[in-house]
Amino acid sequence: MFQPAAKRGFTIESLVAKDGGTGGSPGSGGAGSHPLAVAASEEPLRPTALNYPHPSAAETAFVSGFPAAAAAGAGRSLYGGPELVFPEAMNHPALTVHPAHQLGSSSLQPPHSFFSAQHRDPLHFYPWVLRNRFFGHRFQASDVPQDGLLLHGPFARKPKRIRTAFSPSQLLRLERAFEKNHYVVGAERKQLAGSLSLSETQVKVWFQNRRTKYKRQKLEEEGPESEQKKKGSHHINRWRIATKQANGEDIDVTSND
C-alpha cells in the first residue's frame, strides 16, 4: 500500500530569510537581515492574474487575428471600435504591451475589421427588400426611397383619395343634372365639369355615389313587403311558364292560408 508522503512544515519567516540570504549581496545583510526589511525590498504582491509576463509573439498574433487590435492583453472587447474599450483596463500599468510586441502585432493585424468605420456606412439592399412592406420599416428613412414603400409591392397601400368639398351652387347644379339623367358621359359630362370648374373625374365619382344613394333610398321606401311581393310574383311567373297557363286572376302570394 502507498504510504502518504510526509508533510513539510515551513513558515513565512524561514522563506523570507532564505531568499534574502541566497539572492542578496554581501553588504545587504545576508541571512541576518531583518525580515521586514527584506520584505520591503521585494516586489509588491500582485494578484495571480497580473503576475504573468508579457505575451509572447504567438499569443500576440493570435489576439491580433480578432477584429480588435492587440493593444492590450485584457480589457479589450471583441469589437474594434475605440468607444468599446474599457478605459480603466487601458490605463492599468500591468496591462501595457511591450513595444516589441506592438510592432509584431501591427504587422499581423488584419487591414480592415468588420465593425470599422467603412462598414458602418448605410447598407445597400436589393430593391425587392426595400419594396417589401414587412422589411421596409426596419431601415432608416435615409436608406429607403420615398416611393419604395408606398407605390410598389403587392401589398402596398394606395394613397387615400382626398374628398372633394362641393359648394352649394355646384351641388344644386349636379342634383338638377341627376334628375334629368342618372348617367352623364362623354361630351355632356365634359361640358358639365367645365361649367362647374371641376374635373371629369370629380363629376364621375359624384354621379356614382349619387346613384348608390338613390338605390338605397328606393329600397328603404319600398320596405320588406314590396320585396316579398316581388319574389312571390317571380315564382308565380315561372310556374305559369312551366305549366303554360294564361294570365288569369291574380293570386295573393302574401296570404297565410
From Swiss-Prot:
Tissue expression per record: Cerebral cortex. Expressed in the olfactory bulbs.
GO BP term, pick one: telencephalon development
Keywords: Developmental protein, DNA-binding, Homeobox, Nucleus
InterPro entries (UniProt xref): EMX-VAX-Noto_Homeobox_TFs, HD, HD_metazoa, Homeobox_CS, Homeodomain-like_sf
Comp. bias (Basic and acidic residues): 217-230
CDD domains documented for this protein: homeodomain (cd00086)
Major subcellular location class: nucleus
DNA-binding region: 159-218
Region named Disordered: 216-257
MF (Gene Ontology): DNA-binding transcription factor activity, RNA polymerase II-specific; sequence-specific double-stranded DNA binding
A matching Pfam family: Homeodomain
Gene3D superfamilies for the chain: Homeodomain-like
GO cellular component: chromosome; nucleolus; nucleus
Compartment annotation: Nucleus
SUPFAM superfamilies named in the record: Homeodomain-like
Keyword DNA-binding in annotation: yes
Assembly with partners or alone: Interacts with WRD11 (via the N-terminal and the central portion of the protein); the interaction associates EMX1 with GLI3.
Family named by the database record: Belongs to the EMX homeobox family.
Matches recorded under PANTHER family: HOMEOBOX PROTEIN EMX-RELATED (PTHR24339), HOMEOBOX PROTEIN EMX1 (PTHR24339:SF26)
Its job: Transcription factor, which in cooperation with EMX2, acts to generate the boundary between the roof and archipallium in the developing brain. May function in combinations with OTX1/2 to specify cell fates in the developing central nervous system.
Protein name: Homeobox protein EMX1
Species in which this protein is naturally found: Mus musculus (Mouse)
